[in-house]
């Protein structure tokens, strides 16, 4: 899955960007705890399976 698709998915779930440093973007949600960090040098980069699982876990999203 591409980075832009993941970002679109979590933004539709209510996550919004709170800070960015380089290629790392951090998102926060109004009701869910914690932060979601997405590191992608290009929006067209394919993210590794372990990275995707970590993002889904952080965002509390079922696959």
Regions found by a protein language model. Give the residues of each.
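Major-groove DNA-recognition helix of helix-turn-helix-type DNA-binding domains
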Residues: 13, 17-29
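C-terminal structural segments of small proteins and small subunits
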Residues: 8, 30-36, 40-63
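Amphipathic alpha-helical segments
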Residues: 2-14
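Absolute protein N-terminus
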Residues: 1-2, 63
